[in-house]
Amino acid sequence: MADESPRKIQSLETAHRITEALQELDGAGASAIADRLDIGRSTAYQYLMTLREEGYVTKREQTYHIGLKYLDHGMYARDNHPMIEISRPSLRDLVDETGEIGWCTSEDNGKLVTLDIIEGDRNLNTKFRGRIGNREYMNAHAGGKAILSGYSDSRIMEIIDAHGMPSYTEQTITDEEALLAEIERVRERGVAFNDEEAMEG
């Protein structure tokens, strides 16, 4: 019987790792990418040249950066996500009523992704605004805990096993049993809270 387990395409994986490294490093040269990914400099250069020719990487002076072609794909994915159309009227009403900032988030492969942000009149603290497309850990955000409350405990554990439970502040829940207990409280209350778990203040 043939092996039907999924197999990774190494070259595609390397290309993705390079784009992720460019974002994490806020731009880099071929040598820095090679060191970061532990690949040959010539290999890194070939990938960067190919990505540049396809429009996914741009070069400014001697530094490569992620190209704006990714923005086209990202905006398409966001605008066609069903949550955008469903949530925006309610999100707008909530922001108008409270004057605070409102986020629409969704789980994607075990991470919490920001799909939409609407700012209210009272939101003066810029550090809380975030960015559309941000990918965060589920355990440290009210939105993440709210989403997890709709999942089975086994699915929650799968996400924890895959991504871990990193600490952002002293208040971040990093214990599995404590997180499951908090999620059970969210189920009972019907609402999740963030008690300085993602950032202080």
State the predicted function of each range.
Residues 75-162:
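Amphipathic alpha-helical effector-binding/dimerization core
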Residues 175-201:
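Extended hydrophobic
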Residues 166-168:
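Short loop->beta-strand "edge-of-pocket" segments that line small-molecule binding or catalytic clefts
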Residues 1-84:
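N-terminal helix-turn-helix
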